C-alpha cells in the first residue's frame, strides 16, 4: 500500500493495536508506519530510570521495532547509535531535529529587540529536575556573583507553572538564592510571556544530562537570544559543531568564559539553528515520500555522518 501512518511520538497510547491489525491484513493493504522517536529507555539519564519505568518501556520499544512495515524517525545521530546497539532491525532515519515552525514563533512578538538594548539576563528554561542538572546552574551563578570583576547579571529561571522538581532540594535552594538576590524565578508564564522574556534576554543557558534537541534552543535562536549549551549528546549536531556556543561538559570555568563573550555580543551564527530545525518537517516528508534516503542510517556506514555539520 502507498498509505502512510505517521506517529508524532513513538510512545503513543493505542499504538499497540497496530501490529494486531496489520498482521491480519493482506500485504497489499498494509500501510507503511513511521514512528518519530523523541526519547529512549536506553538513555541512562532519562527520567524513566528515576521512576523505575525503564523495565516495561524497553519492552514497549521492542514491540515498536516488530510492527510490520515500521520505519523509525530518530531525532539525531546519537539516538540512531543507541538503536543500532540495541539491534533494532527496522529501517532507521535521522531527521536531525524536532518539528519546529519559526514563523509561528516570530508572529508572537511585535519586534525582535536589538541585542545591545536587552537586559543583561541569563535564562534557564529546562525543567528543574535532577536530570537537567539545576545544581550546576546554581553553582555557576554563585561563582559568577563571587567574582567582583564580572558584570552584574540577572540569572533567571523560566517556568510554565510553579517551580517544581523531582528533587525538592533544588527548589529549596533556588528559592533561598532568590531571597538572597542571586537569581529570579519567573513562574506561571504563558507562551507569549515566555517569548517576550526571551526577546529581552541575552543568553539562554542549558546544562542538561538528559536532553536531545530541545525546542528551547530553537525558540531562543529565533528571538535573537544567544544560546550556551554543553558539547554533549546531540548538541554538537544541533549547533553544527559551533564551539563558540558550547562549553566543555562539565566545566564551570569554560561555561563562564563562554558566557562572558555571549553576554557582550550576538553570535554571528544567530538564527542558523532555528533555520535548520524549521526544515525538520520537510525532511520527514521527504523520507516518507521516498526522496530522503540520504538520512537512512541502518547500513554499515551509519557512523560516517556523525561528525559532519548538517548545515
Predicted regions, residues:
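Glycosyltransferase donor-sugar binding loop
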Residues: 153-171, 187
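Aromatic "clamp/platform" in nucleotide-sugar-dependent glycosyltransferases that forms part
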Residues: 208-210
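Conserved donor-binding/catalytic core segment of Leloir-type glycosyltransferases
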Residues: 111-143, 156
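Membrane-proximal helix-turn-helix segments that form the acceptor-binding/catalytic region
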Residues: 50-72
Amino acid at each position: 500500500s502507498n498509505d502512510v501512518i505517521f506517529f508524532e511520538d513513538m510512545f503513543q497510547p493505542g499504538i499497540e493495536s497496530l501490529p494486531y491489525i496489520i498482521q491480519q491484513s493482506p500485504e497489499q493493504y498494509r500501510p507503511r508506519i513511521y514512528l518519530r522517536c523523541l526519547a529512549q529507555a536506553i538513555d541512562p539519564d532519562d527520567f524513566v530510570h528515576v521512576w523505575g519505568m525503564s523495565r516495561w518501556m524497553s519492552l514497549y520499544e521492542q514491540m515498536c521495532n516488530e510492527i510490520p512495515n515500521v520505519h523509525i524517525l530518530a531525532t539525531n545521530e546519537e539516538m540512531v547509535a543507541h538503536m543500532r546497539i540495541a539491534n533494532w532491525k527496522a529501517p532507521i532515519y535521522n531527521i536531525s531535529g524536532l518539528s519546529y515552525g519559526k514563523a509561528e514563533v516570530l508572529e508572537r512578538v511585535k519586534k525582535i529587540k536589538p541585542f545591545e538594548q536587552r537586559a543583561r539576563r541569563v535564562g534557564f528554561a529546562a525543567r528543574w529536575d535532577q536530570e537537567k542538572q539545576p545544581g550546576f546552574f546554581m553553582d555557576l551563578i554563585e561563582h559568577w556573583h563571587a567574582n567582583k570583576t564580572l558584570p552584574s547579571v540577572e540569572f533567571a529561571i523560566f517556568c510554565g507553572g510553579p517551580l517544581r522538581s523531582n528533587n525538592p532540594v533544588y527548589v529549596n535552594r533556588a528559592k533561598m538564592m532568590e531571597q538572597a538576590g542571586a537569581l529570579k524565578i519567573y513562574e506561571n508564564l504563558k507562551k507569549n510571556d515566555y517569548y517576550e522574556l526571551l526577546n529581552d534576554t541575552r543568553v539562554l543557558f542549558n546544562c542538561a544530562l538528559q536532553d536531545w534537541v530541545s525546542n528551547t534552543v530553537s525558540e531562543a535562536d529565533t528571538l535573537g537570544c544567544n544560546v550556551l549549551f554543553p558539547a554533549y549528546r546531540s548538541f554538537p549536531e544541533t549547533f553544527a559543531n559551533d564551539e563558540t556556543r558550547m562549553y566543555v561538559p562539565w566545566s564551570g570555568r569554560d561555561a563562564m568564559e563562554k558566557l562572558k563573550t555571549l553576554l557582550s555580543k550576538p553570535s554571528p551564527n544567530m538564527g542558523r539553528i532555528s533555520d535548520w530545525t524549521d526544515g525538520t518537517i520537510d525532511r520527514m516528508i521527504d523520507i516518507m515520500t521516498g526522496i530522503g534516503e540520504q538520512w537512512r542510517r541502518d547500513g554499515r556506514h551509519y557512523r560516517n555522518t556523525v561528525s559532519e555539520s548538517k548545515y
